[in-house]
């Protein structure tokens, strides 16, 4: 079976969804920009030699509809002979795109693929057009489709206090701002055109969503966002609304060597699981355990983790049950996470994987794991091994 390698991984800056840098930039343009950039950065691979493009996106309507993967590829002037498909596993969409491409390569049906994802949550809101079947309440809790309430449930089940949530959220902003100041994101962010507050066109090379002034004291003043009477989860301890895209060049190890391209990491294992929709945020725990089992590893073998921060109330129980609560500052989201950077749904799986690869290189560790929860009760995880 072919070994699957990541040759390159990039992303746009994360733009604020409300009046942010990409308020006048479409999702297809963010995607096409990264497709062009990946090909330009790796000229040994001719675009016509791509076997497929797998692109994650959740809200596939309006500008993100009608197979945005193909629309973006056409905008990027990828040869018409190269196919493209849009993948939807909600929050895990672009990580699923990676898994789909990896399996094609493993079986010999492909040698080189572009994968990634996008979400413009400013142009296409998360709840746009959502219409749950009324009979679904006979099978799952009525609030299972309300992500914030599932996070509240997890926090109560695992003894996660409001103070713990506020502290974790403040850490996310502090870590992300420190990474920005030290240029830790420089290797992954591709400068992308947008508009400043005055409407002037400029190139953005930083994440505008981070709030460096965030403190535990300020977070403590925020009101609960989802359960006003008894809740703990606030806007400050939830993932920010942002716009962005991320992309990876995925190849068979043999083809990469043929072309003289240096792989950055192998895909060691992949896993997707389901869980109770009422605690959808718990999905990373069984997904990570299954991915580790497939890789023949344990959590202690992993040098760094990227765990998507949907909510502080959600990620802390996952960290706790993976036995990592004492290692947060050494291994978990060392450059901050979605609470500070935002969670553009279809983008995030590729985004956290891209950040993980850079952290693995900087920390000089052999193994890394990226994982995320998925709405309505799923989890997805990928173990990477440096080459």
Curated annotation (Swiss-Prot):
Function in brief: Catalyzes the final step of fatty acid oxidation in which acetyl-CoA is released and the CoA ester of a fatty acid two carbons shorter is formed. Involved in the aerobic and anaerobic degradation of long-chain fatty acids.
Principal location: cytoplasm
PANTHER family: 3-KETOACYL-COA THIOLASE FADA, 3-KETOACYL-COA THIOLASE, PEROXISOMAL
SUPFAM superfamilies per the UniProt record, alphabetical: Thiolase-like
Keywords: Acyltransferase, Cytoplasm, Fatty acid metabolism, Lipid degradation, Lipid metabolism, Transferase
Induction: Repressed by FadR in the absence of LCFAs (fatty acids of, at least, 12 carbon atoms). When LCFAs are present in the medium, they are converted to long-chain acyl-CoAs which bind to FadR resulting in its release from the DNA and thus derepression of the transcription.
Gene3D superfamilies named among the record's database cross-references: 3.40.47.10
Pathway: Lipid metabolism; fatty acid beta-oxidation
Protein name: 3-ketoacyl-CoA thiolase FadA
Top-level taxonomic group: Bacteria
Signal sequence, renumbered to the chain: none
A GO cellular component annotation in the UniProt record: fatty acid beta-oxidation multienzyme complex
């Amino acid at each position: 079976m072919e070994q699957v390698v990541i040759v390159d991984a990039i992303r746009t800056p994360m733009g604020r969804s409300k009046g942010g840098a990409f308020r006048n930039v479409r999702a297809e343009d963010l995607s096409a920009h990264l497709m062009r950039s990946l090909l330009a950065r790796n000229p040994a691979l001719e675009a016509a030699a791509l076997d497929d493009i797998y692109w994650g996106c959740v809200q596939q309507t309006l500008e993100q509809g009608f197979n945005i993967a193909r629309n973006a590829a056409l905008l990027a002037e990828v040869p018409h002979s190269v196919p493209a498909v849009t993948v939807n596993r909600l929050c895990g969409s672009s990580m699923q795109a990676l898994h789909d491409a990896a399996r094609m390569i493993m079986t010999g049906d492909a040698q080189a693929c572009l994968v990634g994802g996008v979400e413009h949550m400013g142009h296409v809101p998360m709840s746009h057009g959502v219409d749950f079947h009324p009979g679904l309440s006979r099978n799952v809790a009525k609030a299972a489709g309300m992500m914030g309430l599932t996070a509240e449930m997890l926090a109560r089940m695992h003894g996660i206090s409001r103070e713990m949530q506020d502290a974790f959220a403040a850490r996310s902003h502090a870590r992300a701002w420190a990474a920005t100041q030290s240029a830790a994101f420089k290797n992954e962010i591709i400068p992308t055109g947008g508009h400043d507050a005055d409407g002037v066109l400029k190139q953005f090379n930083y994440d505008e969503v981070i709030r460096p002034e965030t403190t535990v004291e300020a977070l403590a003043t925020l009101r609960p966002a989802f359960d006003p009477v008894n809740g703990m989860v606030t806007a400050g301890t939830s993932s920010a609304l942002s716009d962005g895209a991320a992309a990876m060049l995925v190849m068979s190890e043999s083809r990469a060597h043929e072309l003289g391209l240096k792989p950055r990491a192998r895909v060691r294992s992949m896993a997707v699981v389901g869980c109770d929709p009422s605690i959808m945020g718990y999905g990373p725990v069984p997904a990570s355990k299954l991915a580790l089992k497939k890789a023949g590893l344990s959590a202690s073998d992993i040098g760094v983790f990227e765990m998507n921060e949907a909510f502080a109330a959600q990620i802390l129980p996952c960290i706790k049950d993976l036995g990592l609560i004492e290692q947060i500052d050494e291994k978990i989201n060392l450059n901050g996470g979605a609470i500070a950077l935002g969670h553009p749904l279809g983008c995030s799986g590729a985004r956290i994987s891209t950040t993980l690869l850079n952290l693995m290189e900087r920390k000089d560790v052999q193994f890394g794991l990226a994982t995320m929860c998925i709405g309505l009760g799923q989890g997805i995880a990928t173990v990477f091994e440096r080459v």
